[in-house]
């Protein structure tokens, strides 16, 4: 009943008609003028590695323990309730705190305790704080803000405490740094053709640095799609003999759900280096064939010359 009520509140459903003593106890003081309410989302970083390395039963126990630690920490400021996220990548909680308290300080304090617990499993958490509200029945708006802002972990990195104020600052700083992205992606393609791995790392890093400065997820996805399209064209133009295998890897890059921009940069860099190595081998093979054709032509023309030697062929 408790988790059912909590998820209902977070999703904006009304439970005014429930005649249940537990529900009544859970919803008491929702209009207490001395308190405010806020939803906080905690995402487990590197979640794919988390579910691969930890048995499913232990995963449930870890999240259950996180909820208990969250609620215990909240009692120092007022009260709190936690439950599993519906998408299973962490937990979500509602903290009830005195109006005199600062929600950012509360969130950081709670996050530190949860981080200390997760260190036992070599894991970290990212925390996204919603907008505080005066009524618990309005906490769905706070939850919506927390979920929306959680996407900024992609730019701010794992282990971040993401607040509405931080996101607002990011949006103010967003600008038109993407105008020259086509030129930057062209530089990436040029570095692949140069077969210089350091140049590839530098050009890809410069491109993603520009995207990181903008911190706009919509713009990032558009630019990332453009990069994938250019790499696909490169494969079709130069590496057609390996098209199927390389396109499969490219599709995986496009569909992969990266947690941070650094992960995306690393994935693109590795793939570009692989393309460059294939291109280098192709150029080497073509050069060898051209040399063989020239040698063969020269020998056929001069095979009757008794002075013909390997040195003379090489000189020619």
Residue spans of the language-model regions?
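Short coil/turn segments at secondary-structure boundaries
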Residues: 22, 202-204, 309-313
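Alpha-helical bundle regulatory/interaction domains
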Residues: 167-302, 315-316
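Cytosolic nucleotide-binding catalytic cores of signal-transduction proteins
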Residues: 69-93, 97-104, 111-136, 151-157, ...
């Amino acid at each position: 009943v408790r988790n059912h009520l909590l998820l209902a509140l977070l999703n904006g459903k009304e439970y005014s008609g429930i005649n249940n003593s537990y529900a009544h106890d859970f919803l008491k003081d929702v209009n207490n003028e001395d308190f405010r309410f806020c939803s906080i989302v905690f995402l487990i970083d590197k979640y794919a590695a988390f579910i691969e390395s930890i048995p499913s039963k232990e995963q449930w126990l870890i999240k259950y323990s996180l909820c208990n630690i969250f609620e215990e920490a909240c009692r120092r400021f007022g009260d709190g309730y936690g439950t599993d996220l519906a998408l299973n990548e962490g937990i979500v909680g509602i903290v009830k705190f005195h109006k005199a308290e600062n929600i950012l300080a509360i969130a950081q304090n709670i996050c530190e305790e949860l981080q200390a617990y997760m260190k036992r499993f070599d894991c970290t958490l990212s925390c996204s704080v919603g907008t505080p509200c005066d009524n618990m029945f309005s906490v769905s708006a706070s939850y919506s803000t927390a979920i929306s802002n959680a996407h900024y972990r992609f730019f701010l990195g794992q282990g971040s405490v993401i607040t509405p104020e931080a996101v607002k600052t990011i949006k103010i700083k967003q600008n038109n740094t993407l105008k020259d992205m086509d030129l930057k992606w062209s530089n990436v393609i040029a570095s692949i053709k140069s077969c210089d791995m350091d140049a590839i790392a530098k050009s890809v890093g410069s491109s993603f640095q520009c995207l990181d400065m903008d911190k706009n997820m919509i713009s990032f996805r558009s630019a990332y799609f453009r990069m994938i399209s250019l790499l696909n064209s490169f494969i079709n133009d130069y590496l057609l003999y390996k098209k199927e295998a390389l396109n499969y890897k490219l599709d995986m890059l496009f569909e992969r759900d990266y947690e941070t921009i650094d992960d995306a940069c690393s994935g693109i860099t590795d793939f570009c280096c692989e393309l460059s190595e294939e291109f280098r081998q192709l150029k080497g093979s073509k050069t060898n064939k051209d040399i063989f054709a020239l040698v063969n032509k020269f020998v056929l023309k001069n095979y009757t010359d008794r002075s013909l030697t390997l040195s003379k062929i090489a000189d020619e």
